[in-house]
Amino acid sequence: MARSHDTKGSGGLSQRQLRVGEQVRHALAQVLQRGEIRDDLIERTVISVSEVRMSPDLKIATCFITPLGSADPQAVIKALASHAKFIRGRVAPSLAQMKYMPEFRFRPDTSFDNFSKIDALLRSPEVARDLSHDDDEDGGADEAPRNGDE
């Protein structure tokens, strides 16, 4: 009986894509941490690899990075992209079990920006006012008396 590997309907990645993506992320982070890439910008920038998403055929690894500090994210991505084949070769020994070594594509990780926007929205006076207004309307409905506690 064949299993269905179609994840398009569920909108998520397969377990294999997630596992391989995490292995690639770990191997890439080690290469960056050891300073194996000879590029002035990359050497003087601390780069966080927050996520690696693998294509369904595991041949393309989209790496989401965040340069920490004042480095321009687009400049760091351009530098990493210019060294993508070198990085691929350095990551290969850590991923020897893979049939094909993935092609690396680098993208800026904007999730941290999204988190800070949401946090700012939640802390805004309008939202605080609405939340306090909702609590007043409930009238303590969340705290129903228990048996014997009346």
Swiss-Prot record:
UniProt record similarity statement: Belongs to the RbfA family.
Q: What is its main location?
A: cytoplasm
Please describe the quaternary structure of this protein.
Monomer. Binds 30S ribosomal subunits, but not 50S ribosomal subunits or 70S ribosomes.
- Annotated S-S bridges: none
> Which Pfam families does the record match to this protein?
RBFA
Report keywords, A-Z.
Cytoplasm, Ribosome biogenesis
Q: Name one GO cellular component term.
A: cytosol
Q: Which gene encodes it?
A: rbfA
A single GO BP: maturation of SSU-rRNA
Q: What is this protein called?
A: Ribosome-binding factor A
